[in-house]
A protein has these predicted regions:
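N-terminal, positively charged, Ser/Thr/Ala/Gly-biased leader segments
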Residues: 1-32, 46
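Polytopic transmembrane helical bundles with strong interfacial aromatic enrichment
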Residues: 8-11, 69, 77
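Interhelical loop and helix-boundary elements at the membrane-water interface
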Residues: 9-22, 85-94, 132-150
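Short hydrophobic alpha-helical membrane-embedded segments
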Residues: 23-26, 93-103, 121-124, 145-150
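Small-residue-rich segments of transmembrane alpha-helices in multi-pass membrane proteins
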Residues: 28-32, 84-87, 146-162
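Membrane-embedded alpha-helical segments that form the functional core of polytopic membrane enzymes
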Residues: 28-36, 40-72, 80, 104, ...
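Multi-pass membrane catalytic core of lipid/isoprenoid biosynthesis enzymes
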Residues: 72, 79-119
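Membrane-interface helix caps and helix-loop-helix hairpins in membrane proteins
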Residues: 112-117, 134-142, 161-167
Length: 170
């Protein structure tokens, strides 16, 4: 018996570990903040928007991957989550951490290339989601309140990427 992994299964597990559908919807929130914050579109604006979209996807995907490592044992017990790559054993936790770390680095580099504040918001979002919200989910319903903060950051990230500043408008 050979243990082969197809490119399709790697792709599908990558989509699952990053929660691609959720990540893309969060990216749209960043794009909305960017569009509302930008004064006018130029050719260079599209380049910034592309870096925001890819960097934002990386940050959300990294958060989701870290989350699945942290919650692997709990995920394995629930019907809704037991088939996730780490919980099911298709992906080793260390592989998921490497994927999440690479996404974090790429996301931070892309966001920093827009402006340092964008990278800061990306880093804060990952920290709040993985280090505060995820552990609180099993302890208190107040985790929903805490989760609202990383949930609001993508729009602010888009605004900061467009304007270079964080103000009351965001």
């Amino acid at each position: 018996m050979t243990n082969t992994v197809s490119l399709k299964s790697i792709y599908l597990d990558f989509k699952a570990i990053t929660k691609a559908g959720l990540a893309i919807s969060v990216v749209f929130s960043s794009i909305a903040g960017f569009v509302l914050g930008i004064d006018h579109f130029e050719v260079s604006t599209w380049w910034v928007l592309l870096k925001l979209a890819i960097g934002g996807y990386c940050m959300v995907g990294a958060s989701n991957a870290y989350n699945q490592v942290i919650e692997k044992d709990l995920d394995a017990l629930m019907d809704r989550t037991k088939n996730r790559p780490v919980a099911s054993g298709r992906m080793q936790p260390r592989v998921a951490v490497v994927v999440a770390s690479m996404l974090t680095i790429l996301g931070l580099v892309l966001l920093y290339s827009i402006n340092p504040s964008s990278a800061m918001f990306g880093a804060i979002s990952i920290f709040l989601y993985t280090s505060v919200y995820t552990p609180l989910k099993t302890m208190t319903s107040l985790s929903v309140f805490v989760g609202a903060f990383p949930g609001a950051i993508p729009f602010m990230l888009g605004w900061v990427a467009a304007t270079g500043e964080f103000g009351i408008e965001a």
